[in-house]
């Protein structure tokens, strides 16, 4: 946008300088163009605006001249050309973005394809190993076939020798005949088995690589899935067991800490009341600060944060006390020791709370001083704002809330500390009243100055209109 505006300014300047300076009409036109340039430069320099001269304001009041110059110099066409250039640039940017997206998609696809190629290479590397194993299994099968053929040949030779030997016997015994028949049948069966074995071997050999390939590919995915499921189940079971153990331990701790629940509740209520005090203190301070131009957020946030921290610490101490052993379970000596420890802890807690309250009041004093200083600076920098705030404060009567509003909500458990705080607040209010008087005087003077400035502004407007 700035570049387009700069181009428009350059074009206007070139056209202004190109105008002829012969007649008084052209001189007026040049003045108007210069004023237009000043206005455009003022609009472009927004962080540090440059004021427009009153002469230019007077010249620009004539609308007819401005319109005639705009029509004469064809600025509308130039603006349209600039708009077209911007549209073209946007279209080019969109095209570039689309091209970048397409390139990213192509890169992702290439990555996926490279990953698939790597997987295929891994499987191919595994398959030659299986083939080598199949070849090794085929080699011993061939050796066994040759051994069987040799044994068959030996059996056949022995059978021929036995058949040639007993021929002179005319009438063999029945036992010998039966043995001969058995021997004659056994070689036939062996030959049948031998003939069947080579035919069955190829099928076995074909089956071996199939099983090996299946055994190599199958476990890679199935076993991993099974292992993952088993691990998830084991983790879930372990988590359930841990939760049950924690519940049992908590139940045991609660049963043991039964007698100590009363003091912990008392301590929690005590600190809860303290936390309420802090919140009310912060609310009162925020009201007083709203009258002077501040909402009191700077005090409320740290005080609330401290109260929450203290409350969380006290809850942790109470849980530790609940986790400890009860008083009634131990004999007399141990019970007394526990009581002493409890008393010491209570004393330490009270001491810490007092220290924290002292720190808090000191912090409040520092914040009050800082706020007064900031208010004075703001009054000097921005008189209008200080005047508005002073009028609002007087109209609604938030100036002096009084000590009773701050004392009414305090509990009766710590009357001494409440009275001390009330006196301290009264002193602070007295000191603040002196400061407020000085501030009131300053505000009155500022209001008078503001009224005078308004009168001057009205007069200037009347002069311009006249």
UniProtKB/Swiss-Prot annotation:
Disulfide bonds join 35-56. The modification Phosphoserine is found at residues 114, 215, 288, 312, 353, 386, 413, 417, 433, 447. Belongs to the chromogranin/secretogranin protein family. Catestatin inhibits catecholamine release from chromaffin cells and noradrenergic neurons by acting as a non-competitive nicotinic cholinergic antagonist. Can induce mast cell migration, degranulation and production of cytokines and chemokines. Residues 92-111 have a biased composition (Low complexity). Expressed in the brain and adrenal and pituitary glands. It is found in: Cytoplasmic vesicle, Secretory vesicle; Cytoplasmic vesicle, Secretory vesicle, Neuronal dense core vesicle; Secreted. This is Chromogranin-A. InterPro entries: Chromogranin_AB, Chromogranin_CS, Granin. Binds calcium with a low-affinity.
């Amino acid at each position: 946008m700035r570049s387009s505006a700069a181009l428009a300014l350059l074009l206007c300047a070139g056209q202004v300088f190109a105008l002829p300076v012969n007649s008084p009409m052209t001189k007026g036109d040049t003045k108007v163009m210069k004023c237009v340039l000043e206005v455009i430069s003022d609009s472009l320099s927004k962080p540090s605006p440059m004021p427009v001269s009153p002469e230019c304001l007077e010249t620009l009041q004539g609308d007819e001249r401005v319109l005639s110059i705009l029509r004469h110099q064809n600025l509308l066409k130039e603006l349209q050309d600039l708009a077209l250039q911007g549209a073209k640039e946007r279209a080019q940017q969109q095209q570039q973005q689309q091209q970048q997206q397409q390139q990213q998609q192509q890169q992702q696809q290439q990555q996926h394809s490279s990953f698939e190629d790597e997987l295929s290479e891994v499987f191919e590397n595994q398959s030659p190993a299986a083939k080598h194993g199949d070849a090794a299994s085929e080699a011993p099968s061939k050796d066994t076939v040759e051994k069987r053929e040799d044994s068959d040949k030996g059996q056949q030779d022995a059978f021929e020798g036995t058949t040639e030997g007993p021929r002179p016997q005319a009438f063999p015994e029945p036992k010998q005949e039966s043995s001969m028949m058995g021997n004659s049948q056994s070689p036939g069966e062996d030959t049948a088995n031998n003939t069947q074995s080579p035919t069955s071997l190829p099928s076995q050999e074909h089956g071996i690589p199939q099983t090996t390939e299946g055994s190599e590919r199958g476990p890679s995915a199935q076993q991993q899935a099974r292992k993952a499921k088993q691990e998830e189940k084991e983790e879930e079971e372990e988590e359930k067991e841990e939760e049950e153990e924690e519940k049992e331990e908590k139940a045991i701790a609660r049963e043991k800490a039964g007698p100590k629940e009363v003091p912990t509740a008392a301590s929690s209520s005590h600190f809860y009341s303290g936390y309420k005090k802090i919140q009310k203190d912060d609310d009162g301070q925020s009201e007083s600060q709203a009258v002077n131009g501040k909402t009191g957020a700077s005090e409320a946030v740290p005080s609330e944060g401290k109260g929450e921290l203290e409350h969380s610490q006290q809850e942790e101490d109470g849980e530790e006390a609940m986790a400890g052993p009860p008083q009634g379970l131990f004999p007399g000596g141990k019970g007394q020791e526990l009581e002493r420890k409890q008393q010491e802890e209570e004393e330490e807690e009270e001491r810490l709370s007092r220290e924290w309250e002292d720190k808090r009041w000191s912090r409040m004093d520092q914040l009050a001083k800082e706020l007064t200083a900031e208010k004075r600076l703001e009054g000097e920098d921005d008189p209008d704002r200080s005047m508005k705030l002073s009028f609002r404060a007087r109209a609604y009567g938030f100036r002096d809330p009084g000590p009773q509003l701050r004392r009414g909500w305090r509990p009766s458990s710590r009357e001494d500390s409440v009275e001390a705080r009330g006196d301290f607040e009264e002193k602070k209010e007295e000191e603040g009243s002196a400061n407020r008087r000085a501030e009131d005087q300053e505000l009155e003077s500022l209001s008078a100055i503001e009224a005078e400035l308004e009168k001057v502004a009205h007069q200037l407007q009347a002069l311009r209109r006249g």
